[in-house]
Regions:
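Long, charge-dense tracts
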Residues: 72-301, 318, 339
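C-terminal functional modules of predominantly eukaryotic multidomain proteins
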Residues: 3-30, 566-619
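CN hydrolase (nitrilase-like) catalytic-core segments centered on the catalytic cysteine
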Residues: 29-169, 178, 334, 346-365, ...
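Short, compositionally biased "basic patch" segments
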Residues: 262-318, 418, 427-445, 555-570
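Active-site regions of metal-assisted phosphoester/phosphodiester hydrolases
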Residues: 215-218, 224-247, 406-432, 443-446, ...
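Active-site catalytic loop in hydrolytic enzyme cores
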Residues: 242-264, 376-475, 495
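Cys-nucleophile CN-hydrolase/nitrilase-fold catalytic domain and related Cys-dependent amidase chemistry
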Residues: 310-405, 496
């Protein structure tokens, strides 16, 4: 194939290395002093950025926009060629030594030499294809090779940031300590404040990027967990740092507890799943009137009325009793998860207060919600995390954060029929869209143990690849929890398919969870074989586990036991990294005993008429 005319006009029609460096670091690589109170002097790019994350972000951006990863030869064997980027085994060892000196002693002289060499190619064309074409006078792939040396060095200098190094290196990791200090929440000089109406404290935001000089409206950089074991991308090249999109695309944060992290151990991670609501009425789905009056259209908007929490004390009471039953099955209850839209902030706060009184060992509680702690309505996920003793009071404390759903649920005519909602949502309307504000998408990665990080998705966030799938693949959390308002969680349905994609790349363990109330509506429609699958587990081994609602229609839960396993991830340049993978190790039904499952509780699972009928039949 012949090159296009635009490519032949190479002398004036390409962006240079420096064009993109200046784009991603518009204020230079080093803070410029002010002279006599005047404006700072002109920015400079000759000095190596102080943080490996800045070097990584700048160089990874160069490699991404230039498409250079496809020209990199992963193997250190062989001789290389003029049309490939090759690093010998000796060169790779030298880079490891440079990174170790930078990481442990802050010594960066050798890295500065590489940075200076990169800038010597500042006028070079970004595109490897043009560089390799003969007779163009465009030079060679020299800048690309230097860029790969820099990105590997910066990535190795950040070891210990997302997972522990262990041994002596962990104790002398000055770069890890410096970067962790840069990731502290922006408190504005204030401690976390208790949220009105609960004992939970509002958690301040962590920075969107662990960088100083990078323009976060261009790229962001955060730590990394699992490494993709398939494909040839920048994601599979880095072991410790992740290149992310601009903060306005998705505002991400890497959140860590204030106090030291708990060690990963061989004990199970025991999670109580509570698939509330246990009953959903058809009239809980309500049409939202159109703002354009009576104009004809083939779509509509709907909202959900949470009739199941009209008496919030009922769900609180059930939750505490399920916790007590679960604690009869495990020495340590580690987490509680509710599905999408199960609670609101008020109920969530009260459940958290009561749950931590009964089970102080809990590490986190997650739930879908119709609002957040500021009473902003929408489709939210609420996350409460326990922090060990720290601060002035030297007591454990609980923080809370929230984010909005990234998409809107669309119900088509088939789904309206499947969920038996035709009386509430006209089946003649082609599609019904969930009504809620999205605003700036956010994604929070919660590091809850030394080698373990989780992220939570809300229904369509899992089903739609934009905007967060690429980010999750880059950061590689060990655990992904997907809160759904959906039917049965079957291996052949959409939840399992999209969970498989994240289990394959980058190796996340994924658990979906839906409400028993919506499954009951599907079962009662008679269109499909009845199912009690409220949750589904998928991990990198290909293992698929269906998690079943216990027998009966009353409120119940399931205790899921996960266990960590040492695993080795490998980058495409051959570096081996010790990592942590969570595997499924069983489920146990959690039922209220006969004395606790009185008619008031059964109202949530049977409905008023069925419950009254049951009561009369026992007289």
């Amino acid at each position: 194939m012949q090159d296009s005319d635009s490519e032949l006009e190479y002398a004036t029609q390409y962006r240079s290395v420096f064009d993109e460096l200046r784009n991603v670091m518009p204020h230079g690589t080093f803070p410029q002093p002010q002279v006599g109170g005047d404006a700072p002097t002109s920015p400079t790019w000759e000095v190596l950025p102080a943080l490996p994350t800045d070097v990584f972000g700048a160089v990874a951006h160069l490699l991404r926009v230039s498409g250079t990863i496809g020209w990199f030869e992963p193997s250190s064997a062989g001789l290389g060629s003029d049309d490939s980027i090759f690093l010998s085994a000796e060169e790779r060892i030298d880079l490891e030594e440079l990174a170790k000196a930078w990481r442990t002693d802050g010594e960066s002289e050798g890295v500065q030499d590489l940075w200076t060499e990169l800038l010597s190619h500042k006028d070079a064309c970004l595109r490897p294809r043009l560089l390799c074409q003969e007779g163009r006078g465009q030079g060679s792939l020299d800048w690309c090779k230097v860029a790969f040396k820099l990105i590997l060095t910066a990535d190795m200098a950040a070891e210990g940031l997302g997972r522990p190094l262990g041994g002596d290196e962990e104790r002398v990791n000055v770069m890890r300590d410096l970067l962790s200090a840069k990731n502290q929440p922006d408190r504005g000089g204030q401690d976390e404040k208790t949220i009105a109406g609960s004992s939970l404290r509002r958690r301040h935001r962590h920075p969107a990027s662990m960088t100083e000089r990078i323009d976060t409206d261009v790229v962001c950089v955060l730590p990394k967990g699992r490494i993709a074991q398939v494909g040839c991308t920048l994601r599979s090249l880095s072991a410790n740092l992740a290149l992310l999109p601009p903060r306005a695309t998705v505002r991400c944060q890497w959140a860590e507890p204030v106090a030291p992290l708990r060690h990963d151990d061989r004990a199970t991670l025991d999670i109580l799943l509570i698939p509330a609501p246990f009953e959903i009425q058809g009239i809980d789905f309500e049409e939202v009137p159109s703002s354009n009056g009576g104009a004809a259209r083939d779509w509509g908007n709907f909202s959900l009325k949470q009739s199941w929490i009209e008496d919030p004390s009922l769900l609180e009471d059930i939750t505490i009793k399920l916790i007590r039953q679960a604690k009869k099955q495990t020495k340590s209850l580690n987490a509680i998860i509710f599905p999408e839209y199960a609670l609101d902030w008020g109920v969530f706060g009260k459940i958290c207060d009561a749950a931590w009184r009964d089970a102080p060992e809990l590490e986190f509680i997650i739930s879908g919600s119709s609002n957040n702690c500021d009473q902003h309505e929408g489709n939210h996920v609420l996350t409460a995390l326990r922090h060990e003793k720290s601060g002035r009071d030297n007591r454990p404390w609980i923080s809370a954060v929230s984010r909005r759903k990234h998409h809107r649920w669309r119900l088509d005519a088939r789904q309206v029929s499947d969920y038996a909602l035709a009386s509430a949502l006209k089946p003649t309307v082609a599609c019904w869209w969930e009504s809620h504000k999205i605003m700036t998408p956010e994604l929070y990665f919660h590091r809850f143990r030394q080698s373990s990080t989780f992220v939570t998705m809300i229904c369509e966030d899992l089903a739609r690849s934009d905007p967060c799938h690429e980010i999750i693949r880059s950061v590689g959390p060990n655990l992904v929890f997907a809160l759904l308002m959906d039917g049965p969680q079957l291996p052949g349905r959409w939840g399992a398919r999209y969970a498989s994609s994240l289990a394959d790349d980058p190796g996340c363990s994924v658990m979906t969870l839906t409400s028993w109330g919506l499954i009951r509506r599907v079962n009662q429609s008679g269109k499909y074989p009845p199912s009690r699958a409220i949750a589904l587990w998928k991990d990198e081994t290909g293992s698929v586990e269906q998690i079943m609602m216990p027998p009966g229609d009353g409120p119940a839960g399931v205790l899921v036991s996960l266990a960590g396993k040492d695993t080795t991830d490998r980058t495409i340049d051959g570096r081996c990294v010790s990592n942590w993978s969570w595997r499924f190790h069983g489920q146990q039904p959690i039922l209220l005993n006969q004395a606790e499952n009185h008619p008031r509780h059964r109202l949530m699972g049977l409905g008023l008429r069925a419950c009254l009928s049951s009561m009369l039949s026992t007289r």
